Amino acid sequence: MTLTFPAPSKDKAELETGPAFTPRFDEKGLVTAVVTDARDGELLMVAHMNAEALALTIETGIAHYYSRSRNSLWKKGESSGNTQAVQEIRTDCDQDAIWLKVTVAGHDATCHTGRRSCFYRTVGVENGKARVTITDEHRHFDPAQIYAEKKG
């Protein structure tokens, strides 16, 4: 079974309070997905989903995304083993963003750098220039080793 999504209602009240899930995909056919840890609420990543990725996520309970750089569907954790089991899916008021609450398998890391979250740096100003500072040095796995094993 593959879910399909009806076109969003033009009636704002229906879109915001009605029972129909009608995601508002952008002009490229994507919707933004915000992903947090279901256990502690930590922000893990922000990604994009097309209709197929969203349908697979709902149907399988495992997070799937659409890679804009590769222009392809991607099952999160397929290479690293850090799959995301979806505990809850929410949508925002106008259904143009998705919030996934997940538990991460494997090394409990979401970022391809080996870190738990893709948000491991803070942004600030130093000598009048915007700079980033790494605030999470801990890597749950060695990306060179994990991704080399999958390629080999």
Curated annotation (Swiss-Prot):
EC number annotated for this UniProt entry: 3.5.4.19
Cofactor: Mg(2+); Zn(2+)
Gene3D superfamilies with a match to the protein in the record: 4.10.80.70, Phosphoribosyl-AMP cyclohydrolase (3.10.20.810)
Record field: catalytic activity: 1-(5-phospho-beta-D-ribosyl)-5'-AMP + H2O = 1-(5-phospho-beta-D-ribosyl)-5-[(5-phospho-beta-D-ribosylamino)methylideneamino]imidazole-4-carboxamide
Cofactor binding notes: Binds 1 Mg(2+) ion per subunit. Binds 1 zinc ion per subunit.
UniProt KW Amino-acid biosynthesis keyword: yes
Binding annotation for Zn(2+): 93, 111, 118
Enzyme class: hydrolase
UniProt GO cellular component terms: cytoplasm
InterPro entries referenced in this protein's UniProt entry, alphabetically: PRA-CH, PRib_AMP_CycHydrolase_dom, PRib_AMP_CycHydrolase_sf
Subcellular location: Cytoplasm
Pfam families: PRA-CH
SS bond list: none
Function of the molecule: Catalyzes the hydrolysis of the adenine ring of phosphoribosyl-AMP.
Assembly and interaction partners: Homodimer.
The protein, known as: Phosphoribosyl-AMP cyclohydrolase
Gene: hisI
